[in-house]
């Protein structure tokens, strides 16, 4: 199906940290129907995320940090276990994720592998996230001082099978982290896959 967007009107609703717009537009389908729609769109820029993994040790590095939206939506502590991530600041996704890995985990990773791109909440948010992975080694740990400004971050290194168990039992609820761990299960730790019985 193809659609055509016409008569777009945009109204700025908020410009605090990011921009919230209200769009009014006509949506025409290839069958000839036309419907006026109104949508609020939150523009927070694009981001990047990375899974640090050590195949030999069978471990991954995640971070735990306070996330107010999760607190508002029922996470009693507001703390979220997740993969390192950050917003692009007029730099490339690769440069962004190297910087974020250093700032949030203390690991200096040079060789990063781009895995894929995904819109994380396309019903209302513009953000496109670039997903990466990098193999880490203990000698790449440059500092234990992590986080910038007012971030509350703890670095968590754990066995890969424990991370998968935390997805299954609900201790890991972050979408990007679940996607990265499942990718790693298929591509980096295939022995963790359980054979299906017929």
Swiss-Prot record:
UniProt entry keywords in alphabetical sequence: Hydrolase, Magnesium, Metal-binding
Keyword Manganese: no
EC number(s) on file: 3.6.1.-
An example Gene Ontology CC term for this record: cytosol
Positions contributing to Mg(2+) 2 binding: 100, 104, 151
UniProt xrefs under CDD domains: NUDIX_GDPMK (cd24157)
Span of the annotated motif Nudix box: 86-106
InterPro entries: NDP_pyrophosphatase (IPR004385), NUDIX_hydrolase-like_dom_sf (IPR015797), NUDIX_hydrolase_dom (IPR000086)
GO molecular function ontology, one term from the record: hydrolase activity, acting on acid anhydrides, in phosphorus-containing anhydrides
Disulfide bonds: none
Keyword Metal-binding carried by entry: yes
Binding positions (GDP-alpha-D-mannose): 38-40, 67, 85-87, 104, 127, 150-151, 176
Positions that bind Mg(2+) 1: 85, 104
Cofactor(s) listed in the protein's UniProt record: Mg(2+)
A Pfam family matched in the record: NUDIX
PROSITE patterns the record matches: NUDIX
An individual GO BP term: ribose phosphate metabolic process
All residue ranges annotated as the Nudix hydrolase domain in the record: 43-180
Catalytic activity: GDP-alpha-D-mannose + H2O = alpha-D-mannose 1-phosphate + GMP + 2 H(+)
Domain notes: In the dimer, the N-terminal domains are swapped between the two monomers, such that residues of both chains contribute to the active site.
Assembly notes: Homodimer.
Family: Belongs to the Nudix hydrolase family. NudK subfamily.
Function noted in UniProt: Nucleoside diphosphate sugar hydrolase that hydrolyzes GDP-mannose as its preferred substrate, yielding GMP and mannose-1-phosphate.
PANTHER family documented for this protein: NUDIX HYDROLASE DOMAIN-CONTAINING PROTEIN (PTHR11839:SF18), UDP/ADP-SUGAR PYROPHOSPHATASE (PTHR11839)
Protein name stated in the entry: GDP-mannose pyrophosphatase
Native source species: Yersinia pestis
Gene name as annotated: nudK
